[in-house]
Amino acid sequence: MAYPVFDLHCDTADRIGWATLDLDLRFTAGTDGYFPGDETHPQDFDLIEGNACAISLTKIGKTPWAQCFATFVPDEIPAVHAARFQAQIMAHMSGQAMLNHDRMVNVRSASDIRPALKDGKVACIHTIENATFFAEDPALIEVLKSLGVLMSSLSWNAQGPLASGHDTHAGLTTAGIEALTQMEQAGMVLDVSHLNDECFDEVAARATRPFVASHSNSRTVCGVKRNLTDDQFRTIRDMGGIVGLNYCSEFLSNEATDETAA
């Protein structure tokens, strides 16, 4: 019997949904495809059934699978436009799950996951990476949670309106602190992957509910600042959270090369 897989993060939703975005959003993001070149063979990057991404129904096969499909909001997208970006990517991903309803289920709460796996379906869990638009409209936290967004991060790599990634040393903003509070009240899990150490420490001091790092590795094993320190691992554990492995080779080994890339 196959063991169930629970993957806390992937970029597939953005990659297969990119061509459905409004043109101004793609222009602002600076590329016609999620990765440069995707636009030259769009048939490989539009459907969840079969695609050239890391995750597809074809690749999953019959393995019991719970997949967090993150809507990644690029730092280049202004917060005022980020909610529209998120809505369009999530709509495409949700639509793909509905089109493949014999294989997938759009999860709206944690209690939906086990039944989906028991029925042999892929649990499609909607998440957000870099929810800058929470600073523009905090009420969207409750709205999106009701629509099935179960987890979100506050930043990507750069300094943002809520928090900062590892490119800077800035801490949580006032809006970020408010977002953390409202996410906990709504039952939306906070994802601390990409937060810098300063923001992590502030989250740890303020959080009252478990939080997770969806795709972060060990800084002791691979000394890049995107990874977690041993103390940060302990903090997440002690709060009742979990950490998902990141298969990006440069975060797995100090000796990573193109030949060892996962």
Which residues does each predicted region cover?
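Short, contiguous, pocket-lining structural segments
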Residues: 168-175, 182, 191-199, 203, ...
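Distinct, well-ordered alpha-helical segments
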Residues: 113, 136-141, 198-209
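Histidine-centered catalytic micro-motifs
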Residues: 5-13, 195, 213-217
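Short, conserved beta-strand edge motifs with alternating hydrophobic and charged residues
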Residues: 191, 212-214, 244-247
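Alpha-helix-loop-beta-strand connector modules within alpha/beta enzyme cores
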Residues: 97-98, 171-186, 203-213
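Catalytic beta/alpha-barrel core
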Residues: 104-107, 188-195
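N-terminal hydrophobic targeting/anchoring segments and the immediately downstream early-domain regions
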Residues: 1-154, 159-169, 174, 223-262
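Acidic, glycine-rich loop-and-beta core segments that form the ion-binding/anion-interacting portion
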Residues: 197, 205, 210-211, 215-237
